[in-house]
Amino acid sequence: FPYTTLFRSIRPNARFVMFDACYNGSFHLDDCIANAYIFGDGNTVVTQGNTVNTIQDKWPDEYLGLLACGVRIGQWGRHVHFLETHIIGDPTYHFANTVDPALDMNRAIVVSKKDNAMWYKLLNYPNADVQCMALRKLYENHAPGLPELLQKTYEASLFGVVRMECMKLLYQMNSPEL
């Protein structure tokens, strides 16, 4: 992979790099671009890449806005990765919470993951990806009346990603509301 030789002469400053292509995270090879970022002279802390061919009809930036809420890269990855997708570097790395320091989404996702009352409340939060995660957790918790809630949310939301999350979850439920 001659393209990684470029990284021996530069210092990438991105703390997190997300590769959305096949083989960019092939850590098992002697030379891969994700490793070049991590082990080079730059300041990259964590990368995400795919080791082999990856499906093309995926949603690679799903929940990406949660990173602005201080969600750890590994925690985000747990919700979006496919079998061939990997974190290379520090999965505990996170950006500063610039959305709402009073909202600890890491804690919500791990400690309060079964708290449907909290997730219902977060459906009204002004951040689209927080709303998407709330829908996802209600789905995982088998919340009663979810197909109707997803249909209602789809019809009312001003956020495209929230509407997409509703369609995705309705599809996964094989719901006639879709």
Residue ranges with predicted function:
Residues 3-6:
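Short, small-residue-biased leader/transition segments that mark boundaries at the very start
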Residues 134-135, 151, 166-167:
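Hydrophobic core positions within HEAT/HEAT-like alpha-solenoid repeats
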Residues 118-120, 149-152, 178:
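Buried hydrophobic core positions in alpha-solenoid tandem helical repeats
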Residues 11-49, 53-57, 62-82:
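Catalytic-core region of carbohydrate-active enzymes that cleave or remodel glycosidic bonds
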Residues 123-125, 152-159:
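Solenoid-like repeat scaffolds
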Residues 20-23, 49-52, 80, 91, ...:
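Active-site proximal loops enriched in glycine and acidic residues that flank catalytic Cys/His/Asp
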Residues 60-144, 163:
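Caspase-like cysteine protease fold
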